[in-house]
Structure formats: C-alpha cells, structure tokens
C-alpha cells in the first residue's frame, strides 16, 4: 500500500524522469534483454540491437505507461486495465517478467539520477513497481 509520503515521492521522481522517458525506458529494456535474455522471446519482430528504433519506441511506451500510472496512484487497476488485458490475453507475457523489467528500471534511475534518487524514493518506487506488476498480473488469475 502506497502511503501519502510514497505518493509525494513518486510525483517528485516522475518530474525528474518525464523529460527522459524514451532514454530511460529503452535503457531499462536493453538492460533487461542483456541481463535476462529469455525476455527477448516476447519481441521476435523487434530489432533488439542497442539504440534500435523499436527498442527506443517501446521503451518510451513503457515509461509513458508508468508515468500515467503515477498520475493515477489511487486507481492503478483502472489506469492499467488496458495494458493488463493486452499482456495477459494477447501477448501472454509471463508475469514474472514485469519484476525483471522493474529491477532494470530501478538500476537505470539510480545510474542517471544518482543522489537525487534517495533511498526513500527508491523504496517508494519499488513499492509502486510491485503494485504495477500486481495489477498487470490480475487478469492472469
């Protein structure tokens, strides 16, 4: 459960991320593909080389979806319903992969934001990403 302080920290964090969505999102995807190569199977039609248009475009979509979720912290299920349907019914992505991408996104933020990514902000974002992963996995039950 996200506290009022968590929500405040997440809003502050996303203000720092907003101008870098494509960069951070694509870097998180690239990191996931390198660290967890089995995740590449969900992208057979993508050029997965670093810096490819497809990875950059999808990274931007991922980060934008997270940004929309930050704007809807009190109603994540509704905000992510369409994405949950897409990943569960059409793409059939194993929900374990959401946590892998979340870990990679954390590393990207820590790398780029440095001291601006405080332990409290990290903890709030971790709770948020866990909540997002849970919502995305809801339709699998």
UniProtKB/Swiss-Prot annotation:
Molecular function, one GO term: organic acid binding
Tissue expression profile of the protein: Red blood cells.
One GO BP annotation of this record: hydrogen peroxide catabolic process
Signal sequence region: none
GO CC term, one of those recorded: hemoglobin complex
List of residues binding heme b: 58, 87
Keywords: Heme, Iron, Metal-binding, Oxygen transport, Transport
Domain of life: Eukaryota
UniProt domain Globin: residue ranges: 1-141
The keyword Metal-binding is annotated on this UniProt entry: yes
PROSITE patterns from the UniProt entry: GLOBIN
Subunit: Heterotetramer of two alpha-D chains and two beta chains.
Family: Belongs to the globin family.
General function of this protein: Involved in oxygen transport from the lung to the various peripheral tissues.
PANTHER family: HEMOGLOBIN FAMILY MEMBER, HEMOGLOBIN SUBUNIT ZETA
Protein name: Hemoglobin subunit alpha-D
Organism: Chloephaga melanoptera
Gene that encodes it: HBAD
């Amino acid at each position: 459960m996200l506290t009022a302080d968590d929500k405040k920290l997440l809003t502050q964090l996303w203000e720092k991320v907003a101008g870098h969505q494509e960069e951070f999102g694509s870097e998180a995807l690239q990191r996931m593909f390198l660290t967890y190569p089995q995740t590449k199977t969900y992208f057979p039609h993508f050029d997965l080389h670093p810096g490819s248009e497809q990875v950059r475009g999808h990274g931007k979509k991922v980060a934008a979806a997270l940004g929309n979720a930050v704007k809807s912290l009190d109603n994540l299920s509704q905000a992510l319903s369409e994405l949950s349907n897409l990943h569960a019914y059409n793409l059939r992505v194993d929900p374990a992969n959401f946590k892998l991408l979340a870990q990679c996104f954390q590393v990207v933020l820590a790398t780029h934001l440095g001291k601006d990514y405080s332990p409290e902000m990290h903890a709030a974002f971790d709770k948020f990403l866990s909540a997002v992963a849970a919502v995305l996995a809801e339709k699998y039950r």
